[in-house]
Amino acid sequence: MKVRNSLKSLRSRHRDNRLVRRKGRIYVINKVQRRFKARQG
């Protein structure tokens, strides 16, 4: 999982990326291509 300041650019890299908020953190998850996982640091 990558830790990035801005997730908007990561989300636009694949059309199946989802922006999810869990426990006060923001994540990008992708069920199809799992390598696009990221968390906002």
From Swiss-Prot:
Keyword line: Ribonucleoprotein, Ribosomal protein
A Pfam family: Ribosomal_L36
PROSITE patterns: RIBOSOMAL_L36 (PS00828)
GO MF, one annotated term: structural constituent of ribosome
Keyword field contains Ribosomal protein: yes
A biological process term (GO) from this entry: translation
Domain of life: Bacteria
Record-level GO cellular component terms: ribonucleoprotein complex; ribosome
Similarity comment text for this entry: Belongs to the bacterial ribosomal protein bL36 family.
NCBIfam families reported in the protein's UniProt record: PRK00831.1, rpmJ_bact
Protein name according to UniProt: Large ribosomal subunit protein bL36
Naturally occurring in which organism (per UniProt): Rhodopseudomonas palustris (strain BisB5)
Gene: rpmJ
